[in-house]
Every structure is written in structure tokens, then in C-alpha cells.
Swiss-Prot record:
Binds ribosomal protein uS19. The gene is rimM. Belongs to the RimM family. Gene3D superfamilies: PRC-barrel domain, RimM. It is found in: Cytoplasm. Keywords: Chaperone, Cytoplasm, Ribosome biogenesis, rRNA processing. It comes from the Bacteria. An accessory protein needed during the final step in the assembly of 30S ribosomal subunit, possibly for assembly of the head region. Essential for efficient processing of 16S rRNA. May be needed both before and after RbfA during the maturation of 16S rRNA. It has affinity for free ribosomal 30S subunits but not for 70S ribosomes. It holds the Pfam family RimM. The keyword rRNA processing applies. This is Ribosome maturation factor RimM. It comes from Stenotrophomonas maltophilia (strain K279a). GO terms for cellular component: cytoplasm; ribosome. The keyword Chaperone applies.
Length: 170
């Protein structure tokens, strides 16, 4: 696996919830409330100031995730935090299940076809709802459905390689 001590962006502060210092969060975890399981948080303000926070509590209010940061007691403090990004160390995440991957672990891997044709490297992934899509950048950008075993034949972190069944001309 790649550098497991790198930071993973899990969410951001989107605004205040009420007047007593509660914080509305946007989370990119699945499920979204899982963001509270992974701590400590490394928060980076829009100006680049980083702070480590432990003991964050939160809940899913239906429309938003709502959190309490230690020491944050009023709406003005929260509003000044708008746009703050929430990170954790990669090592804070549990190991993925067999044949499951964290997207961040796939980024940067080389991609080759089953015939050995190099297509480029994994740039990023996104979800369509039906399946995830891996974006490969090389001589051009390709979007390949991350569907195993139909299109993605293997992922080998030791070899830094994803093998796909894909027409290099497509």
C-alpha cells in the first residue's frame, strides 16, 4: 500500500448550526456520519492554519451533520471556520475489506491493459451511482468503469499497477 501516513480529506465546515457553537459539516465518508469515527482530526483553515482536534462529537440531524468542537462556543467562531477542511491520517482508517479499496490508495497507480499496453496513471475516481469510475491520465484521459472483474482485472499495490480489460483506442 502507498504512504499510509498521508492525510485524507474527509469533509469540511459549511457553516453554523444555531447560536451555541454547533457546526454544520459536509462529509465525504460512507455513510456520512462515519466521519466521527476517525480521529484525531487535522483541520486546515482557508488561510492554511492547521490544528489537531480530538474529542469531536457529532450527530446526523437529517439534513446536515452537526458537530461540536472542543472550545467552540458561539456562532461567530463557527462562521470564521467556514471552509475549514477536515483531514485524518490514512492510518486512522480501518483496513479495507478484500477486493475493496480506498480511492486515495488507487490514485497514482499505473494502469495497463491485459495486453500490457500502458494507459497512464489513476488520476482520481468518482461515483455515478451505478458504479465508480476510474479516471486514467496518460496520452489522453480515459474514464473506465471500476467494475471487477468485468473491466478491472487486478489491483497490485506491490507492483503499483491496475490491470484493465479495455481497448486502448477507446
Amino acid at each position: 500500500m502507498k504512504d499510509i501516513e498521508r492525510r485524507i480529506l474527509l469533509g469540511r465546515v459549511v457553516g453554523a448550526f444555531g447560536v451555541r457553537g454547533e457546526i454544520k459539516l459536509e462529509s465525504w465518508t460512507e455513510p456520512r456520519s462515519a466521519i466521527f469515527r476517525y480521529q484525531p482530526w487535522i483541520v486546515r483553515s482557508p488561510s492554511g492554519v492547521e490544528t489537531t482536534i480530538e474529542g469531536v462529537r457529532g450527530r446526523d440531524s437529517g439534513k446536515h451533520l452537526v458537530a461540536r468542537f472542543p472550545g467552540v462556543e458561539d456562532r461567530d467562531t463557527v462562521e470564521a471556520m467556514r471552509g475549514t477542511e477536515i483531514y485524518v491520517a490514512r492510518s486512522a482508517l480501518p483496513p479495507p475489506k478484500p477486493d475493496e479499496y480506498y480511492w486515495v490508495d488507487l490514485e497514482g497507480l499505473d494502469v495497463k491493459t491485459t495486453e500490457g499496453v500502458a494507459l497512464g496513471q489513476v488520476s482520481h475516481l468518482f461515483s455515478t451511482g451505478a458504479n465508480d469510475v476510474v479516471v486514467v491520465r496518460g496520452d489522453r484521459e480515459r474514464m473506465i468503469p471500476f467494475v471487477q472483474p468485468d473491466f478491472v482485472k487486478s489491483v497490485d499495490f506491490e507492483a503499483n499497477l491496475v490491470v484493465v480489460d479495455w481497448d486502448p483506442e477507446f
